[in-house]
Design a protein with these regions (language model features):
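Loop-to-helix entry region of an early transmembrane alpha helix in multi-pass inner-membrane enzymes
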Residues: 80-84, 97-117, 156, 302-312
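Membrane-lumen/periplasm interface segments of specific transmembrane helices
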Residues: 28-40, 44, 53, 192, ...
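Transmembrane-helix motifs of polytopic, lipid-linked glycan transferases
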Residues: 106-131, 317-321
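Transmembrane-helix signature of polytopic, membrane-embedded enzymes
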Residues: 101-105, 122-150, 184, 331-335
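Short hydrophobic/aromatic helix or loop-helix immediately within or flanking a transmembrane segment
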Residues: 55-70, 75-99, 286-293
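Multi-pass, polyprenyl lipid-linked donor-dependent membrane glycosyltransferases
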Residues: 114, 142-177, 184, 191-202, ...
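Transmembrane alpha-helix segments characteristic
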Residues: 324-346, 352-355
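Signature aromatic-anchored transmembrane alpha helix within multi-pass, membrane-resident enzymes
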Residues: 246-250, 372-402
């Protein structure tokens, strides 16, 4: 009986992939739990896993799941800064379970289910996106699974934060786009746009893929770019399915804006309330990066000087990696990655780590970079990345603003 299962396991790629994902996920969560008593040794007051895993915005999502949207606090902060899909899912499970389960535990359950699904389809997308004639499929699989469960900042995916749900939607959008299933890609983008503001920009993924397909079809024409653009426009207009897929991409944010219009009279309330968090005004992107990288954010900044320097340079290197991805013809990944990072950089470097990780495409860039190294070098790098994740978990448990 056992030998039959082993044989089936070896021959069934989907089962093998899912099993590997579950094992690595479980090991990563054991590490997170094991670090709780270690943290309690140095903490002023001992706490449990639910406390350590859910700092900052998790409190807002807990409030949303339990009480819904409310009027602003005296500080000017309001929970309508946070998009509705994730807390709605948590609220639904809370209702189904009769409120007997801790809301943080529900949020973590949702996040963990979403990230497992995300990693499964992330591997399948990576197989399609990366050159499997050049790179080994198992190596691609192992690196993606490692990065998303044990790489730096993977701790986000276990918390009551939107990162897991958003990443799942992004991955499904990329995967379905690559498979030319544009309608499902559009639905995934719509769900992403109801989860975080960056989600509405996933429309560029569909646009890019459709255009590149047309560009390849006109490779023999002299004015190739012009011909491809004309063919692309004609194809989209004449294909109701593609047109609808593109149209529904920002549906989530439009529905939320309609709700806000009726709730507080301001469809852009989620944007306007951000000034309660980001008090410093800097020139978008360039000014933010220059001030951050040179440690000149000033006293008005919500980010510590050292954290600002680290985040600033991480953003610079990440943007450079996205440019390299464009050069290596990962067009949709590179374009979306740049846009997804530009949005927070219009005002601050705060939370940019979450935007980088949540956009998912960073994993494709890192995976290809690791595949280009020798096996021994790759193993050393992955050990260092795992050590960095342990540091990230420690920083997260102690509410370090670097990971905010």
């Amino acid at each position: 009986m056992f030998s039959v299962f082993i044989e089936h396991y070896k021959n069934n790629e989907k089962l093998r992939l899912f099993t590997t994902i579950i094992v690595v996920w479980l090991l990563s969560r054991i590490v997170m739990q094991a670090m709780v008593p270690v943290m309690n040794l140095v903490a002023d007051t001992p706490h449990n896993l639910l406390y350590y895993m859910n700092p900052w915005d998790a409190e807002w999502y807990k409030e949303l799941a339990e009480e819904g949207y409310k009027l602003p606090r005296s500080s000017g902060m309001a929970n309508w800064a946070f998009f509705p899909l994730y807390p709605m899912v948590c609220a639904l499970i809370r209702i189904i379970t009769g409120g007997y389960i801790n809301t943080y535990a529900i949020g973590m359950l949702v996040s963990n289910i979403c990230i497992i699904i995300a990693v499964y389809y992330a591997v399948r997308f990576a197989w399609l996106e990366l050159d499997t004639d050049k790179y080994d499929r198992v190596d691609i699989e192992n690196i993606i699974i490692f990065l998303m469960f044990a790489g730096p900042c993977a701790v986000y995916y276990g918390s009551m934060y939107t990162e897991s749900l958003f990443t799942m939607c992004v991955v499904l959008c990329f995967y379905n786009t690559k498979k030319k299933n544009y309608m499902m890609a559009g639905v995934s983008a719509a769900l992403a746009s109801a989860t975080r503001i960056v989600g509405c920009t996933l429309i560029v993924v569909l646009f890019t893929d459709m255009y590149v397909s047309m560009y390849k079809q006109h490779r023999d024409e002299e004015r190739r770019i012009v011909a491809a653009i004309k063919a692309f426009i004609k194809d989209v207009i004449s294909d109701a399915g593609k047109l609808l897929a593109l149209a529904i991409c920002p549906l989530g944010i439009f529905v939320y804006m309609t709700f806000l219009r009726g709730f507080c009279g301001d469809a852009w309330a989620f944007y306007h309330v951000q000034k309660a968090w980001r008090t410093q005004k800097l020139f978008p992107v360039i000014g933010v990066l220059i001030k951050s990288c040179t440690g000149r954010l000033g006293e008005m900044s919500d980010v510590k000087q050292i954290n600002g320097i680290i985040l600033g340079w991480l953003c610079v290197f990440t943007l450079l990696m996205y440019v390299i991805m464009l050069v290596r013809k990962h067009y949709a990944c590179g374009i979306f990655g740049i846009i997804a990072l530009m949005i927070p950089l219009t005002s601050s470097v705060m939370s940019t780590l979450r935007f980088i990780v949540g956009s998912f495409v960073v994993y494709i860039g890192i995976t290809e970079a690791l595949l280009l190294t020798g096996r021994n070098t790759r193993r050393v790098i992955m050990v260092l990345l795992a050590a960095a994740e342990v540091i990230c978990i420690s920083a997260w448990y102690f509410w370090d603003g670097l990971l905010m």
